[in-house]
Amino acid sequence: MSDRTNVYDEAQMGRNRVGYGKWPAVVVVDLQYGETDESHPMGSDLSDVIANTNDLVDIAHEKGAPVFWTRVVYTHPDAADAGLWTKKVPLIAEWKPGSRWVEIDDRCHVGNDDHILDKRHASSFHETELDSMLTSMGCDTVIVTGCSTSACVRSTVDDASAHGYRTIVPETCVGDRSDEQHEAHLWDLDRKFADVEPVDAVETYLRGL
């Protein structure tokens, strides 16, 4: 880690913070049973991630800030709408309408006015309405939570930054089936595309809206 840190420091990566904007949205990535139920081969224990995300979502609800929940769903009979992703991750072909694996975990505090977006690829922005909805709502900040840190969270953060949003990742509100990948990607995201923040700091920001 020290060698990597030195290289990034010399390149001035992560030197500055993007900071918080005036109006945020919380984007909760893929807390569906295919990811949160340990009986599924792709599932892992994300109890703490769900609990910490719920705390943020509850504050967002109180303040009237928009909350989006994304999930991976394939409508084509053989999951052709996944493209080549099923070549690398074949089990996601099971994630179809009516399957338990596409349902958002019941422990999540989904509000009546929240927005549920179905997606077919890793990023919550790719071929979804997310960007246009954020723009119409006047959002300049995206708070990304959910799973997995190394894949769908990562892709969502990358795209949020590319679309010009101040991108915040509460460090205990994201998770991964691999602790090693989780830590590595959080470290890298904080240096390149987002502010990885203590959840308390994000809660304080939301309460101040």
Kindly give the residue locations of the regions a language model identified.
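Short glycine/serine/threonine-rich phosphate/pyrophosphate-binding segments
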Residues: 149-156
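Active-site-proximal loop->helix
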Residues: 177-190
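Internal catalytic-core helix/loop-beta-alpha segment
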Residues: 98-146
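Glycine-centered short loops/turns at secondary-structure junctions
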Residues: 62-65, 138, 164
